[in-house]
Amino acid sequence: MGIVDEFQALKAETDADLLAMQVGDFYEFFAADARTVASVLDLQVSEKSNHGSSYPMAGVPVDDLTPYLAALVERGYRVAVAEQSETDAGDIEREIERVVTPGTLLASTDADPRYLAAVVREAGGDWGLAFVDVTTGQFRVTRGADRADAVTELYRFAPAEVLPGPALRGDDDFLGVLRERTDATLTLHDAGAFDAGRATHRVREQFGDGVIESLGVAADGPVVRAAGAAVGYIAAADEGVLASVSRIQPFGGGDHVELDATTQRNLELTETMTGGSDGSLLATIDHTASAAGGRRLAAWVTRPTRDRAELDRRQAAVGALADAALARDALGDVLGEIYDLERLASRAASGRADATDLLRVRDTLAALPDVADALTTTPELAESPARDVLARVDRAAAADVRAELADALADDPPKTLSEGGLLQAGYDEALDELLAAHDEHRAWLDGLADREKDRLGITHLQVDRNKTDGYYIQVGNSETDAVPDGEDGAYRRIKQLKNATRYTMAELDSHEREVLRIEAERAELERELFAALRERVGERAAVLQDVGRALAEVDALVSLAEHAAANQWVRPELVAGDGLDIDAGRHPVVEQTTSFVPNDARFDASRRFQVVTGPNMSGKSTYMRQVAVIVLLAQVGSFVPADAARIGLVDGIYTRVGALDELAGGRSTFMVEMEELSRILHAATSDSLVVLDEVGRGTATYDGISIAWAATEYLHNEVRATTLFATHYHELTALADHLDAVVNVHVAAEERDGAVTFLRTVRDGATDRSYGVHVAALAGVPEPVVDRARGVLDRLREENAVEAKGSAGESVQAVFDVDSGGFVDDAGDDGEADDPEAAAVLDELRTVELAETSPVELLGTVQAWQDRLED
């Protein structure tokens, strides 16, 4: 069987997108795979002949596979890797050892988490979700009540790969939303892996017999099915990767602030509405020095906690660090030099760590005492909970690992095991003996050239080595007459060059054989010693991951303190129950780029629902987002951008701010808006913060007003959530006279000599001006259009009819005709745009003969008219 035939046979065994097959010192790709890889990785394509046919071929050196593999997988490809081995008979065999996928890639160059997600929906409606980050060993599971819950968590975790359960594979709506809101690769894993029996066995096998009971979920429920499918998928792809995953943790709505996917987007927590990270809340407050610290801060921002004790602990730590500038600087310097210990530990546990990885483990553990010293010797941190972070790790075990690595590893190890020189002298007696013998032979070889020059009396002689000729003596052709050819010390010619001749001799051959034997034995022994060392480190991966998480937490706390100190943020007072009082609050992102006008926000039992009016572009949306972000930051454990803040803890933050058509899901702007509103009305509680902006604007005016009015009443009377409701429906301001906790506030503007100035100040009371035409002028709309708009606006204010009923009873939009001075329907027909039924009643009223109609008959007629009008 030819190489290409073998490649194609192996490719048929896997459903991976690409196959990398080891052929000697290279991993080769053939046929269509070669073209794909060459295009993605910018490799040269050559041709390989096979049975008279020619096939494209591209390859990478064995020692360089990892970065190329990562580049392919990070672009969404699943790559099978076939290794070669030699049998006892000397034959070469190849078989697929692993499949590397977007969710099982260990060697990721991206600092962000890299989750594999499995999602299960049961017939009863419950959802189960499992999220595994094999690069750090994290495995988290949760239950969802509906599709919105599932989408929220998938948006939050942003997995690299998703395994939808059998019931979801035909759910086009769910899959469409998943493709739209994440960049995940969708993989249809073996449906049997989601079976309750197989999944339960997998979970218990990986985490222990009692683990399911500790999770508090049903053994045959969707959570365990999702977890088991994820474990099975990883095992099928690469069994070794599972060694990094030793703990499984549940999470649920009760331990964190609910932030649905819409809210995360609207508040621009990790990316802006345009898709980039610059300008997001996280990018603004992230001053972390390490990749792990950045991941920890991102987790806090996207999953704020409801744990009051944890919030108090974080706030106290941030406050103390904010007052300790020298300690922050010292910690920043140390943390900036450490490596990603969580990921390094996972690679060690899976058997994938190389010498450089272990060297980085050693250096990171060596920094641990420096971090501890900065935390414990700084007076400002004497009572700080920041000190307690490192108390939660086994520093003695970590010190043992560091000491063993320091004794074992050379300071500058080679890139690959085959090069040798990984381990220090004195680490292993047998290795030291081999190295000493090797040095003796090398010393003889190093002195051979000078000895032969002296013996033969020539100058152009050198001793060297290459893969083809081994060790050789090279003599310039002008001096070859001096080369000995007798029995004693005779040279044997091995290659003729243009200007020189290469020779060997019996004594050189003997030393070469010994050098090669020693090098082979040394390489094999070093591989064994290194593998044993790596295994011992991997066995303590849990300790190392704990240390990595502790360092990440310190880094995140220092980052929050740095931002608080640099921007004059204050520690908010956290209280149970409702109530929100912010003095001179600011938006944390906007204040970085513009001169910001601070605003107060006051919410209590008598003003927990605030209707916000004001001109377009005046800052209503910024103000409302500002309030929401300040509340969120408080429950991250951060200080907040304000002069003072008293914040009642919330169980969720829900927003509906703007909407775009979701064409992939076939849903219009208004449908998206109503779905988001429905989610809020069902999910929010009296402990929630709700932010609504322009509800009802996606439909006809009267429909929109009606929906906004009814939603306001429901939120006020039934949900009783703290609410900000921005609107241009000025009719809603009348609700303040009818609902006891509704108040009106507005963003002020000043109009003088036809010019409008937006003051950005929030004041009590309502406004009935939107200044939309003024905004159009600011946006550069042509002056004739703006002038015409002003004229239409003036006439519209005189006649308030906007919508009418058509002749067939359907709703139609009425359009004001400035030239005629009246309204026409949307077909352009002149008319009063009144209800035809009402017009008929009016006609009958005009013809009633009052003098000839008895009071009883008149009463009956009026009753009939009323019935007709109500219908």
UniProtKB/Swiss-Prot annotation:
This protein is involved in the repair of mismatches in DNA. It is possible that it carries out the mismatch recognition step. This protein has a weak ATPase activity. The lineage of its organism: Archaea, Methanobacteriati, Methanobacteriota, Stenosarchaea group, Halobacteria. Belongs to the DNA mismatch repair MutS family. This is DNA mismatch repair protein MutS 1. ATP binds at G614, P615, N616, M617, S618, G619, K620, S621. Keywords: ATP-binding, DNA damage, DNA repair, DNA-binding, Nucleotide-binding. GO terms for biological process: mismatch repair. InterPro entries: DNA_mismatch_repair_MutS, DNA_mismatch_repair_MutS-lik_N, DNA_mismatch_repair_MutS/MSH, DNA_mismatch_repair_MutS_C, DNA_mismatch_repair_MutS_clamp, DNA_mismatch_repair_MutS_core, DNA_mismatch_repair_MutS_N, DNA_mismatch_repair_MutS_sf. One of its GO terms (molecular function) is ATP binding. It comes from the Archaea. The gene is mutS1.
